[in-house]
């Protein structure tokens, strides 16, 4: 699983996942499924915010080609992927600037158009079950919840899906592709079932296959949301985007 993750996710996402696990004292060599889950969640958060901006009239627009105008503002603030101290600093800054209610738990994004924090969920189970778990944990109507599954299903607070259909389809396509790639390597069952994972760990099973290239529709896109995470994040003059190919498996 670790080899699969390193081959099929952008190096920046892998690095952020490694830092996250280290911060919580988790060993990615042992908890490889969690490593894969964190990378997947990070990718969905970045894809959620990709190409979405707010123009001078306060309207939400999509800019996919070239660099966006300096007059455009990023619609989403990415909180996920930061260390906890910096993440709470960003949340506090948003609350002080917008008047938003401070959440009890760290959310994943902030939507400047709808003026709300967003909790993103990616589940291997039924979306409604995971949604209820999230809602019971957060216990706040102020934080918007949006759940995606690896089967193409989704569920959101009050059926408000925030993004346009094409943007959501891009996320669903990527998740379905990850599922297919895992299944082709015999990794999916252990990823879904902790019991199966333990059984495979005891046997010392390890996938040796190389990751095949992803479908062109997904692999050729770039991810403007992969930015250097630093304190200047909240400034209007954001740090430069890391223009890396979005989560592309290397071709042999």
From Swiss-Prot:
Alphabetized UniProt keyword annotations: Decay of host mRNAs by virus, Eukaryotic host gene expression shutoff by virus, Host cytoplasm, Host gene expression shutoff by virus, Host mRNA suppression by virus, Host nucleus, Host-virus interaction
Location(s) in or outside the cell: Host cytoplasm; Host nucleus
One BP annotation, GO: viral RNA genome replication
Active site: 80, 108
One GO molecular-function entry: RNA binding
Xref: InterPro entries: PA/PA-X, PA/PA-X_sf
Claim: Metal-binding is one of the keywords in the record: no
Site entry (Important for efficient shutoff activity), positions: 28, 65, 202-203, 206
Signal sequence range: none
Site (Important for efficient shutoff activity and nuclear localization): 195, 198-199
UniProt KW Cell inner membrane keyword: no
Main location: host cell
Reported function: Plays a major role in the shutoff of the host protein expression by cleaving mRNAs probably via an endonuclease activity. This host shutoff allows the virus to escape from the host antiviral response. Hijacks host RNA splicing machinery to selectively target host RNAs containing introns for destruction. This may explain the preferential degradation of RNAs that have undergone co- or post-transcriptional processing.
Family: Belongs to the influenza viruses PA-X family.
Domain notes: The probable endonuclease active site in the N-terminus and the basic amino acid cluster in the C-terminus are important for the shutoff activity. The C-terminus acts as a nuclear localization signal. The C-terminus is recruited to host protein complexes involved in nuclear Pol II RNA processing.
Protein's name in the database: Protein PA-X
Organism, as annotated: Influenza A virus (strain A/X-31 H3N2)
Gene (name only): PA
């Amino acid at each position: 699983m670790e080899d699969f993750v390193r081959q099929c996710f952008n190096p920046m996402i892998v690095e952020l996942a490694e830092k996250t696990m280290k911060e919580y004292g988790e060993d990615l060599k042992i908890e490889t499924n969690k490593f894969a889950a964190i990378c997947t969640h990070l990718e969905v958060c970045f894809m959620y915010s990709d190409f979405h901006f707010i123009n001078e009239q306060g309207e939400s627009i999509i800019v996919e080609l070239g660099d966006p105008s300096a007059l455009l503002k990023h619609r989403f603030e990415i909180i996920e992927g930061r260390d906890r101290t910096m993440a709470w600093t960003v949340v506090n800054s948003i609350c002080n600037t917008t008047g938003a209610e401070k959440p009890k738990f760290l959310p994943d994004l902030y939507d400047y158009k709808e003026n709300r924090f967003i909790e993103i969920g990616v589940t291997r189970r039924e979306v409604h079950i995971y949604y209820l778990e999230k809602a019971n944990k957060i216990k706040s109507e102020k934080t918007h919840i949006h759940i995606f599954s690896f089967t193409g299903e989704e569920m959101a607070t009050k059926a408000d899906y925030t993004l346009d259909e094409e943007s959501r389809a891009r996320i669903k396509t990527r998740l379905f592709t990850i599922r297919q790639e895992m299944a082709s390597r015999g990794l999916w069952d252990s990823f879904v079932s902790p019991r199966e994972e333990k059984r495979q760990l005891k046997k010392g099973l390890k996938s040796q296959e190389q990751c095949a290239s992803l479908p062109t529709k997904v692999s050729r896109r770039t991810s403007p949301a992969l930015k250097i995470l630093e304190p200047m994040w909240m400034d209007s003059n954001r740090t430069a985007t890391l223009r890396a190919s979005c989560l592309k498996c290397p071709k042999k």
